Amino acid sequence: MKIVIINGSARKGNILTAINAFMKGAADRNAIEVIQPDKLHISPCKGCGVCQCHKGCVDNDDTNPTIDKIAAADMILFATPVYWWGMSAQLKQVIDKCYCRGMQLKGKKAGVIVAGGSPVDNIQYELIRKQFECMAGYLSWDMLFQKSYYATAR
């Protein structure tokens, strides 16, 4: 299975630790690629809709090559720290740009890893979980897991 991991954290902290643990368990049976949005040049989606008449985003940046990788994957793993009760801006920007080819993402397997500075019964995790459940329902994803971590230490 081809797995794409979108690392929504620019830091080498708890999210990277969780990604590495996932990769350790999955690497011998799968092809895994990690996308680091903070290392890419991806402009914010302008909502222009031109992408609906073309074969992808018209911005001359890293959007189309990034979405190509996501569209080619069998599974997408979204990994994010909690930023103000939501996913990180880095991850959200990649998700927003998926609009240009959204229906090509139908029927995939998905997973979510979230790390925050509050206990896992805090509403912040529920808010993020609901966002991914809505995306999964819309795109007919098989949501394999959603795991939240109280990131008190690595």
PLM regions with names:
Residues 105-145:
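Short, glycine-/small-residue-rich phosphate/pyrophosphate-handling segment
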Residues 1-101, 137-151:
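N-terminal beta1-alpha1-beta2 submodule of the flavodoxin-like/Rossmannoid cofactor-binding fold
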Residues 13, 120-122, 154:
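Short, charged/polar "capping" segments at the starts of alpha-helices
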